[in-house]
Amino acid sequence: MNPTETKAIPVSKQLEGPHSPNKKRHKKQAVKTEPEKKSQSTKPSVVHEKKTQEVKPKEHPEPKSLPTHSADAGSKRAHKEKAVSRSNEQPTSEKSTKPKAKPQDPTPSDGKLSVTGVSAASGKPAETKKDDKSLTSSVPAESKSSKPSGKSDMDAALDDLIDTLGGPEETEEDNTTYTGPEVLDPMSSTYIEELGKREVTLPPKYRELLDKKEGIPVPPPDTSKPLGPDDAIDALSLDLTCSSPTADGKKTEKEKSTGEVLKAQSVGVIKSAAAPPHEKKRRVEEDTMSDQALEALSASLGSRKSEPELDLSSIKEIDEAKAKEEKLKKCGEDDETVPPEYRLKPAMDKDGKPLLPEAEEKPKPLSESELIDELSEDFDQSKRKEKQSKPTEKTKESQATAPTPVGEAVSRTSLCCVQSAPPKPATGMVPDDAVEALAGSLGKKEADPEDGKPVEDKVKEKAKEEDREKLGEKEETIPPDYRLEEVKDKDGKTLPHKDPKEPVLPLSEDFVLDALSQDFAGPPAASSLFEDAKLSAAVSEVVSQTSAPTTHSAGPPPDTVSDDKKLDDALDQLSDSLGQRQPDPDENKPIEDKVKEKAEAEHRDKLGERDDTIPPEYRHLLDKDEEGKSTKPPTKKPEAPKKPEAAQDPIDALSGDFDRCPSTTETSENTTKDKDKKTASKSKAPKNGGKAKDSTKAKEETSKQKSDGKSTS
């Protein structure tokens, strides 16, 4: 290594310290571009070399001999090291010598040359400043060359690698103005409408194609003689068949004649070509086709013509007038727009009045019996004979051989209501064989599980129940003609209305006992049946509707038949097996309704219920009633002491209930009163049973209050 190079290394390190390797690469590229600029402009470089030689003619004699040394040695390493040292010591001399040392570098493009030529002219004042700085940087490098380098070989190798990156250079922006020609952009944006976007922009040729697709008839072009189906098949199947070479001449003539017509036809439409009639015996190989046939087919199609490019500049935009939508009334839409000639004129009467259209006569609905008769005509053999036409001779022969029971072929469902008469051999019927064949094809009828089910209405009605008051439910709704006239007594009080009833004849005790004990006795004789009918009517009125007292039936009379004794013995044995009956504690309790109702009883004061509510007009009536009545309570007769049951005879105990029965007149009055009370309660009872009970309770409470008030007064 030269001493100048070793001295230049620390200088390069000092300069490289604050900069990044990316900047080094960038600067190295800038160093390479500068000699290219200088090579283009030779005059400034020659002047610059003269100046540098005058300033330092003796200090640096090496750079002039360096290019020749590098070219002779051919070593890249020595050339790079020298280039680094030259960049540090004399950058100005390096710019002038690099184009000579590197003649193999590629020449820049035309665009770069034009730019470098401009920059070289304006970069002269900046180069003088760089020369001054390079002179100052070379002075400390010479002073450091006297010091020995005590670095190892590894450090030297690293330094050599670092030197290959190139030394840093001060980059100063050139504040030069561009003096070249003005750059102009002649391009301008223009809107071009798409072809076919509007109907105006469609060319006439495309219009014809659209008309064909839409189905608009177009006049057919003038064609020569039309080809028949045989000629077309022959022309298409010539290439597919493998024919002898002698027939090639004929093919070419046919191709020439039919080629023009077949060009317009598409190949995809023809699915299979049949062999010509005169070549039916030849076998066509479908799997393998010769290349010549395919080439001939492709040649017959012709080459595809390129579509001519349309000049978009010739297309002019046409502004269409904005069409407004107007609704026009059609003739006949409204009555006003109908012309008078076409208006319907109603048929006029003699007086000028329009005649009403006659109502169509509706057919009367047929009754069930008429419908059944119409449906059963087919089953009735006598009516069918009249309707049937004259049978043919074949049917007569078949009927003579074997009559056909037609009733079996009819399904049971169709004969649910109508039962046909037993079948008889009739003329003109279907033969047995045909009916049996048809019946065999039908198969057996499966039993329908829904046949036995009752018919249900599947129609769901949306009718709601509405509670309407019936005529006569309330007193207000009773017409005045049907209202009961109130019977008043001498004092003006209304008397209760009594229904007139037929007087009941008095019955003797023996007659009543016989009527009651009739069920306990043996079977009645045939002569007494007529009398029992009379007794039942009389006894029904005598017997009270209240619960009958428990009575023990008397034993049958001793003059009974032996059959009755056997029955009694059997009954006794059964009664012994049952055991004694235990008394039920709930037997004597009054019957209570177990239905719980939510209706609450509301007590309302009625007029006259209390002394406060009695009007003064009716006060004197109550005072008269109180004066007339005795204040002493009615004395009750002392009841006779009852005898113990053990002391009484069983006959007296049984007949005691019959002795206590009231007279017939009293019983009849009691029954009539009971009936009146029940009818009154039924008519006044509301629909809810709870309200009726509440009203009865309220009446009992009011009656108690009245009795208490009277006693206190």
From Swiss-Prot:
* Residue spans of biased composition, Basic residues class: 21-30
Q: Which Pfam families match?
A: Calpain_inhib
Where is the cross-link described as Glycyl lysine isopeptide (Lys-Gly) (interchain with G-Cter in SUMO2)? K32
| Residue ranges, compositional bias (Polar residues) | 85-94, 542-553
For region Disordered, the annotated ranges are: 1-187, 211-506, 536-713
Q: Name one GO biological process term.
A: protein catabolic process
Task: Quote the biased-composition stretches of kind Basic and acidic residues, using this chain's numbering.
Answer: 46-63, 248-258, 304-332, 342-367, 380-397, 443-502, 583-646, 691-713
Q: Which GO terms describe its cellular component?
A: cytoplasm
Q: What is this protein called?
A: Calpastatin
**What is the native source organism of this protein?**
Sus scrofa
